């Protein structure tokens, strides 16, 4: 079925969702004052790298600009300079702003506005990498070979200056017209080679239609539900964040920059991890592929099979949706105080608990993507596009609840509840009394299985709490200094805050989509729609169908055949309960 957009709008009030989930838009006055008066604690010790012509790539209108990039093709491969807003330099770790950020966990994007991690005066002004402004940054330098594999990498504190603010659509248009900004002229080739490297590692990338709620400019208070376009430029750009997160994880696990000898001291890390999928889940997916007539050679990985599918075939939607079930169990793993061993073992600790153990939040599938896209965005299947450095974690099966933050979670932002952040109940846990775990962490369970390597969140500190802490560890390791005590004290509370906020973000995001779907369809009960059956009924749950016009996904009564295009009838759409249902046959 052709996945297309159509303008369908209705009046939707998201205030009830804010109230239901306790999202307070106002920032405490004391914390706001701290943000207003924030100064760069490392102003006198920064490298001046304002000579690098950085650019930012973000959704139109975004002001919380975490990342600025410059990439060049060299005689030996590629050199990536990636500047990340240095939030740790402008927040007093013992002050009111740090305490409030610890409670919030991450920024919440709803269709009608944000609930920010930090006050806008900081996140959208003084700490944001806005064009033509000198800004403090954590500057990553990553030297890659011709295959875009990292050879040397490190991070330092620097002053940077962005030259231009770009968006994904314009970057794609410029790439198509062969007129890319010089600072990112090498991005397409670099991105393609990184994507290929990911497939070689066993990475899994999903391409599912992403529902977005956007404002209807022609009708006050009305909102539209559309399929969010995703460009190749999105994929290329997220590869930079993904690469940076992989380098960050290696620095934390090795205890040093890439060109230094691995440390034999304490291993301190905040990793984004995901366990490998069960073989039974892969076997089930192979049976589904066979039933749909999709050729899947026995020696071909899941990622390569998915990458080779026809994006417009109904079977692709079914398999991509089922693949979300392979990407479950994403969470944060804290290592603190372990002595790194030759086999990669080290002590881990659980979030919010004084006893040891790896942090693993059961939040389902995750992928990276920018949570600030043009509206509340939910990928069908609860998963954003995989691939990049920060995919927002998404969870669940088709139509299921999404989670936050992604393989990484990649960093495309949305202006409304889209793959984004959270307000949580506050920090929990602490370092006091922590004991080594009796189950040493292994190389396998320190990995992010969707990425095929260890990974960390370090590229979105204006919007996600974990990134500030992981970045500080990397800065200390590369400088050869001790990791600050406030960072070590905050690792477990931060992981716990992220776990809570991820869960809440998914619920809020799903609620915004459900409310919009049910409101748009409320006057169309009994109407007949063309649909693709993305999941058949199994006796314990109904079938699930995707409607392209308007783009909705919902349960279907009856037994429609999986992977087929059928006609279904809308039998229920209730904005009060935020539920919709279809029926088959009509």
Model-derived features with residue positions:
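Electropositive polyanion-binding surfaces
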Residues: 2-352, 391-392, 398, 407, ...
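Long, intrinsically disordered low-complexity tandem-repeat segments
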Residues: 350-410, 416, 421-425
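Short, compositionally biased
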Residues: 582-586
């Amino acid at each position: 079925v052709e996945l297309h957009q159509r303008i369908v709008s209705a009046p939707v009030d998201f205030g009830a969702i804010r109230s239901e989930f306790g999202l307070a838009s106002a920032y405490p006055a004391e914390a706001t004052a701290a943000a207003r008066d924030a100064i760069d604690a490392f102003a006198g010790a920064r490298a001046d790298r304002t000579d690098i012509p950085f650019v930012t790539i973000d959704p139109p209108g975004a002001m919380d600009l975490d990342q600025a990039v410059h990439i060049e093709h060299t005689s030996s491969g590629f050199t990536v300079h990636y500047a990340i807003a240095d939030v740790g330099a402008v927040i007093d770790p013992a002050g009111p702003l740090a305490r409030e950020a610890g409670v919030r966990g991450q920024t919440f994007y709803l269709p009608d506005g944000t609930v920010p991690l930090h006050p806008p005066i900081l996140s959208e002004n003084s700490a944001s990498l806005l064009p033509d402004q000198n800004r403090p940054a954590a500057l990553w330098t990553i030297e890659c070979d011709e295959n875009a594999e990292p050879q040397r990498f490190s991070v330092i504190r620097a002053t940077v200056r962005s030259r231009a603010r770009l968006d994904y659509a314009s970057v794609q248009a410029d790439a198509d017209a062969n007129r890319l900004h010089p600072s990112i002229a090498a991005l397409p080739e670099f991105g393609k080679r990184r994507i290929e490297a990911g497939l070689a590692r066993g990475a899994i990338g999903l391409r599912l239609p992403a529902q977005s709620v956007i404002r209807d400019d022609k009708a006050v208070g009305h909102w539209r539900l559309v399929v969010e376009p995703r460009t190749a430029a999105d994929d290329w750009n997220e590869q930079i964040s993904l690469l940076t997160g992989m380098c960050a994880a290696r620095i934390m696990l090795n205890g040093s920059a890439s060109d230094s000898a691995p440390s034999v001291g304490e291993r301190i890390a905040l990793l984004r991890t995901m366990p490998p999928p069960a073989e039974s889940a892969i076997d089930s997916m192979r049976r589904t592929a066979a039933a749909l007539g999709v050729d899947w050679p026995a020696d071909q990985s899941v990622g390569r099979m998915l990458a080779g599918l026809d994006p417009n075939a109904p079977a692709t939607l079914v398999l991509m949706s089922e693949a979300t079930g392979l990407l479950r169990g994403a969470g944060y793993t804290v290592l603190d105080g372990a002595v790194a061993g030759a086999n990669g073992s080290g002590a881990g600790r659980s979030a919010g608990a004084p006893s040891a153990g790896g942090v693993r939040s059961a939040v389902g599938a995750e992928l990276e993507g920018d949570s600030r896209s043009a509206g509340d965005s939910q990928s069908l299947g609860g998963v954003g596009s995989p691939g990049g450095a920060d995919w927002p974690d998404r969870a669940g099966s088709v139509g299921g609840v999404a989670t936050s933050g992604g393989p990484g979670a990649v960093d495309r932002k949305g202006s409304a509840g889209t793959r984004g952040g959270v307000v949580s109940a506050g920090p929990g846990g602490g370092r006091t009394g922590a004991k080594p775990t009796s189950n040493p962490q292994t190389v396998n369970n320190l990995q992010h299985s969707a990425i095929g390597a260890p990974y960390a969140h370090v590229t979105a500190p204006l919007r996600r709490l974990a990134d500030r802490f992981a970045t500080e560890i990397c800065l200390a390791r590369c400088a050869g200094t001790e990791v600050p005590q406030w960072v070590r004290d905050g690792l477990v509370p931060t992981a716990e805050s992220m776990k809570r906020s991820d869960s809440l973000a998914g619920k809020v995001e799903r609620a915004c989509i459900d409310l919009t779907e049910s409101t748009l369809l409320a006057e169309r009960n009994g109407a007949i729609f063309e649909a693709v059956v993305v999941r058949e009924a199994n006796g314990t749950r109904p079938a699930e169908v995707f409607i392209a016009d308007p783009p909705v996904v919902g349960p279907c009564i009856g037994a429609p055949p999986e992977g087929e295009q059928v006609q279904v009838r809308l039998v229920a759409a209730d904005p009060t309960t935020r539920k919709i249902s279809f029926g088959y046959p009509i």
